[in-house]
């Protein structure tokens, strides 16, 4: 029974680590998308 609990805890730690990495990557992509949009808008509307 204790061995099963250890495996569950390991799996849970792995899952929570994956979730935190996914959240971090989503935040980075959001920032990059915002920056790219801003730069495109400045490039398009900069001549006016």
UniProtKB/Swiss-Prot annotation:
Keywords: Cell membrane, Developmental protein, Membrane, Transmembrane, Transmembrane helix. It is a single-pass membrane protein. It comes from the Eukaryota. One of its GO terms (biological process) is shoot system development. GO terms for cellular component: plasma membrane. Its main location: membrane. Residues 13-44 are annotated as: Required for DVL/RTFL small polypeptide activity. The chain crosses the membrane at residues 25-42. It is found in: Cell membrane. Small polypeptide acting as a regulatory molecule which coordinates cellular responses required for differentiation, growth and development, probably by restricting polar cell proliferation in lateral organs and coordinating socket cell recruitment and differentiation at trichome sites. PANTHER family: DVL19-RELATED-RELATED. Belongs to the DVL/RTFL small polypeptides family. This is Small polypeptide DEVIL 19. The gene is DVL19.
């Amino acid at each position: 029974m204790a061995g099963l609990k250890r495996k569950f805890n390991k799996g849970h730690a792995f899952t929570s680590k994956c979730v935190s990495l996914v959240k971090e990557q989503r935040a980075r992509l959001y920032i990059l998308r915002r920056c790219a949009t801003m730069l495109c808008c400045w490039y398009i509307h900069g001549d006016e």
